[in-house]
Structure formats: C-alpha cells, structure tokens
Amino acid sequence: MIPGEMLVEPGDIELNVGRATATVKVANSGDRPIQVGSHFHFYETNPALKFDRAIGYGMRLNITAGTAVRFEPGQERTVELVALAGDRKVYGFNGKVMGALDKKEGK
C-alpha cells in the first residue's frame, strides 16, 4: 500500500438504508443564515427555523456525514430527515432532551 492510497470497492454506498425518514418544510424566519450539520438533533435547531418540531424529534438531516445544509434568511426549503440510530440518547445540543429519546414505561 502507498501512503495515502485508498482502496475502494466498486459500486455505490447506500446511506441510512432501512431507517425511518420524514420530509419537512423549513423556513428561516431570522435575519441571518443558519447552518445545520449532518448529525445535529433537528428538533433542537435554532428557533428561527420554523417547521413542525414534532417531526424533527429524534431525527437528523439525511445527508452525508460531515456536511451541512444552510438556510438563508427568508428561505424556505423541504428537507429529508432520518431517525437517529444507536442507543437513541441525546445530550447537549440545546439541552431539550438530555437523555433517552424513547422513554420506556417504568424507567
């Protein structure tokens, strides 16, 4: 192997196969651009982004890791969200969840 060399299998890589998705219309009501990263809990995004927050609960943008979507002031666009995976625990962001997304009875 040569330093920096990448050995890549032929074909396409499908992201987030089998995960629940949702489509939501989002509008930036603020006076500044807002950028949302690929793994940000969409429910907790900037309050100037107007959309049905219930749809964004437990979801993130369905985009490639490490990328982001920018919402310009006054812009409205439709985005696809995908369910967070793993343990489905959310900490940080804007502190609105701070624990398990799926609350179980008796816990």
Curated annotation (Swiss-Prot):
NCBIfam families: PRK13203.1, urease_beta. Disulfide bonds: none annotated. This is Urease subunit beta. Belongs to the urease beta subunit family. The keyword Cytoplasm applies. The lineage of its organism: Bacteria, Pseudomonadati, Pseudomonadota, Betaproteobacteria, Burkholderiales. Its main location: cytoplasm. PANTHER family: UREASE. It comes from Janthinobacterium sp. (strain Marseille). Its EC number is 3.5.1.5.
